[in-house]
Design a protein with these regions (language model features):
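Domain-length accessory/inserted modules outside core catalytic folds
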Residues: 1-107, 111-124
C-alpha cells in the first residue's frame, strides 16, 4: 500500500527541475494518465511535465529520484482496493487559499492527463 506523499518535499523536488508545472498539476496529470492506461511508464509522465533533465546534475538526479518515488507510490495507491489515495495538494496546515489553488491545479492536471491519454467518450 502506498504511503501519503509529502506535498512540500514533492514541490521542492519539482521546482529544482526544468518545468512550468506545479507538483499538484503534475500529480493530477499522472492520475489522469493512470485512470486510462494502468501500464503507464515513469518516462511517459516525465516527458509530459519536464522540458529536460540532466541526470549528471546531482540536484536534478535527486529530484528525479523523488519523482520516481511519487510515480511508484501513486501507482500503488491507485491500484489499492481499499482506495487509500490522496492527491498531492497543500495540507491542512497551509493557508486555505493555497489548499484551494493546489486542488484546482490538481483537477486541471487530471483533466489534461485524461485528454492526453485519449480517453474515449460518447454522446449517449
Amino acid at each position: 500500500m502506498g504511503q501519503p506523499i509529502n506535498y512540500d518535499l514533492a514541490k521542492d523536488a519539482l521546482q529544482k527541475l526544468n518545468t512550468d508545472d506545479t507538483i499538484s498539476s503534475a500529480h493530477g496529470l499522472l492520475c489522469g494518465f493512470y485512470c486510462v492506461k494502468q501500464d503507464i511508464q515513469l518516462d511517459d509522465w516525465l516527458n509530459e511535465i519536464l522540458v529536460s533533465i540532466d541526470l549528471n546534475n546531482l540536484l536534478e538526479k535527486e529530484s528525479h529520484h523523488v519523482l520516481a518515488e511519487i510515480f511508484n507510490n501513486t501507482s500503488e495507491q491507485l491500484a489499492d482496493p481499499t482506495l487509500n489515495f490522496s492527491p498531492v495538494i497543500a495540507d491542512d496546515a497551509s493557508p486555505l487559499r493555497e489548499q484551494a489553488n493546489t486542488l484546482i491545479e490538481w483537477c486541471q492536471g487530471f483533466l489534461v492527463g485524461l485528454g492526453l491519454s485519449s480517453v474515449e467518450t460518447s454522446d449517449e
